[in-house]
Amino acid sequence: MAQAGSADPGVGGHWAAGPRCAPWRWALALLWLATAAGGPSRRQWPVPYKRFSFRPEPDPYCQAKYTFCPTGSPIPVMKGDDVIEVFRLQTPVWEFKYGNLLGHLKIMHDAIGFKSTLTGKNYTMEWYELFQLGNCTFPHLRPEMNAPFWCNQGAACFFEGIDDIHWKENGTLVLVATISGNTFNQMAKWVKRDNETGIYYETWTVQASPTKGAETWFESYDCSKFVLRTYKKLAELGAEFKKIETNYTRIFLYSGEPTYLGNETSIFGPTGNKTLALAIKRFYYPFKPHLSTKEFLLSILQIFDAVIIHREFYLFYNFEYWFLPMKFPFIKITYEEIPLPKRNETLSGL
């Protein structure tokens, strides 16, 4: 995303005009200048998620505690006349390790299941972090680097099979639609493009307040958003979804209008803002991983002081830094209904 700046008011006309022309020319000039100067500051909210032309190779420094997509396989090409069942899959985050612990807090992970009628094979498709959630939410402060170092990538994972117990025991496994093999193949091409261009994970949804219709400053980009994008694409391709309730976890931050600060070079580079750079690193320091119990408790107090008492939060979005003037209630986890999409009636027979 381009950095906002004031437009160059290079006026081509001559302001040294005769007395009778001066008033209206001055008025037009001032109006033009006001429009030009004010235009870039009126940002688009929410800030659009930046897409890329390719997915970069991860830095070797970034290591996953749990291997990403260990049994992944290419998405198969289905026969056009196959009938594919589409399943909504949802389970508590880290259910494989903690069971239903996070399910009580409605912190859920979402995925999509498919079953081919012709072959009887099942498949799972999900989108999640390459290096776990903490690395996608907060950076590493490496002594040899001036700028915070981010291990933040998310990607799609497709593999054969659906672990029924994993999804059913504490979550959801329910049929939501039936599509043709042709529609599945079209979806697969879209998934490939989506995965190559949407490369990083975003934990937070940032809004002005919890009230309905409040301004949204930034949207999250996570597992549930991938599922919602895929459902929307299937509906565009003609899929008809069942009328069932579907809820999703969202983690909100609440703030006044964000202030754009700059990117890594403009803040942490040789000619960067040293005061701002230090403030950002101080903010992120309590979030560092591998803490002892004593360090962890101290960090909680430091985070409380920064976010609640001083009402400050530094957000990294689109590889750029923003300042959030935090507002009550500061942070909230919700489990909201987002309806399944309606079929595109202009595309029949798909």
UniProtKB/Swiss-Prot annotation:
Transmembrane segments: 26-42
Cytoplasmic-side segments: 1-25
Sites where a glycan is attached: N122, N135, N170, N195, N247, N263, N273, N344
Catalytic function, reaction form: S-hexadecanoyl-L-cysteinyl-[protein] + H2O = L-cysteinyl-[protein] + hexadecanoate + H(+)
Keywords: Disulfide bond, Glycoprotein, Hydrolase, Lysosome, Membrane, Neurodegeneration, Neuronal ceroid lipofuscinosis, Signal-anchor, Transferase, Transmembrane, Transmembrane helix
Disulfide-linked positions: C62-C151, C69-C157
Pfam families registered for this protein in UniProt: CLN5
One BP annotation, GO: signal peptide processing
Active site, renumbered: H109, C223
Region Membrane-anchoring: start-end pairs: 296-335
Keyword Hydrolase found: yes
InterPro entries linked: CLN5
One MF term in the entry's GO annotations: bis(monoacylglycero)phosphate synthase activity
EC number: 2.3.1.-, 3.1.2.22
Gene Ontology annotations for the cellular component aspect, listed alphabetically: cytosol; endoplasmic reticulum; Golgi apparatus; lysosomal membrane; lysosome; membrane; perinuclear region of cytoplasm; vacuolar lumen
Lumenal side: 43-350
Post-translation changes: N-glycosylated with both high mannose and complex type sugars. Glycosylation is important for proper folding and trafficking to the lysosomes. Can undergo proteolytic cleavage at the C-terminus, probably by a cysteine protease and may involve the removal of approximately 10-15 residues from the C-terminal end.
Clinical condition linked: Defects in CLN5 are the cause of neuronal ceroid lipofuscinosis (NCL). NCL is characterized by brain atrophy and the accumulation of lysosome derived fluorescent storage bodies in neurons and most other cells. NCL is found in Border collie dogs.
Family: Belongs to the CLN5 family.
PANTHER family per record: CEROID-LIPOFUSCINOSIS NEURONAL PROTEIN 5, CEROID-LIPOFUSCINOSIS, NEURONAL 5
Function (record text): Exhibits palmitoyl protein thioesterase (S-depalmitoylation) activity in vitro and most likely plays a role in protein S-depalmitoylation.
Subunit structure, as described in the record: Multimer. Interacts with SORT1, RAB5A and RAB7A. Interacts with PPT1, TPP1, CLN3, CLN6, CLN8, ATP5F1A and ATP5F1B.
Name of the protein in its database record: Bis(monoacylglycero)phosphate synthase CLN5
Organism: Canis lupus familiaris (Dog)
